[in-house]
UniProtKB/Swiss-Prot annotation:
The lineage of its organism: Bacteria, Pseudomonadati, Pseudomonadota, Gammaproteobacteria, Enterobacterales. Keywords: Cell inner membrane, Cell membrane, Membrane, Transmembrane, Transmembrane helix. It is found in: Cell inner membrane. This is Protein YkiC. The keyword Transmembrane helix applies. The gene is ykiC.
Length: 39
């Protein structure tokens, strides 16, 4: 398990709530998840 990836996602979720830009954050999370799957 890559704990750094989960930590990054948690930070992204917190950032989404703080700046209210959930669409951009979700796009970043999806991109990060795809990168995690392929690498």
């Amino acid at each position: 398990m890559n704990y750094k990836a989960f930590t990054q996602i948690a930070i992204d979720l917190l950032s989404a709530k703080l700046c209210n830009c959930t669409q951009a954050i979700m796009t970043h999370i999806i991109a990060s998840f795809l990168a995690f799957m392929f690498f």
